[in-house]
């Protein structure tokens, strides 16, 4: 199986002046060919993110890699929540973290197969735990 490894970390901060909030801008990158999350320095080259795409030090593209952004939120155990994280609440309801045009959301599946979307904020995440991610635990979303 695949194993989870380190995340990318950008030395940037997002500042939201309206809410007086500052958060780290971090990413993790999933490599579909190697079936794992890549580290910032994986192998003999460095990777970066430019315009939402993973690039090598000489600008080469890596289309097999998917970029997932840190949400700025943590689950009830203090684990950082990223796009693609799978969360579970105390009622064993499960959803996946997604970005939409309207912001950060949790996409949950009803018993009848329909989906519903819930806006995410730290208050909402305080009783949720991360039980996996979209790449290594797709079976949790069935």
Short names for language-model regions:
Residues 1-142:
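Secondary-structure transition motif
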């Amino acid at each position: 199986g695949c194993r989870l490894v380190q995340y990318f970390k950008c030395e940037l901060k997002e500042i939201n002046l309206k809410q007086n909030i500052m958060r780290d801008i971090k990413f993790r990158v999933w490599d579909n060919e190697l079936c794992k999350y890549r580290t910032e320095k994986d192998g003999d080259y460095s990777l970066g993110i430019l315009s939402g795409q993973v690039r090598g030090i000489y600008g080469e593209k890596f289309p097999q890699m998917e970029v997932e952004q840190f949400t700025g939120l943590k689950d009830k155990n203090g684990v950082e929540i990223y796009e693609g994280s799978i969360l579970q609440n105390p009622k064993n309801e499960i959803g996946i973290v997604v970005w939409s045009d309207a912001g950060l959301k949790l996409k949950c599946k009803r018993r009848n197969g329909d989906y519903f979307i819930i806006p995410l904020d730290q208050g909402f995440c305080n009783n949720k735990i991360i039980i996996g991610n979209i790449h290594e635990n797709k079976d949790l979303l069935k």
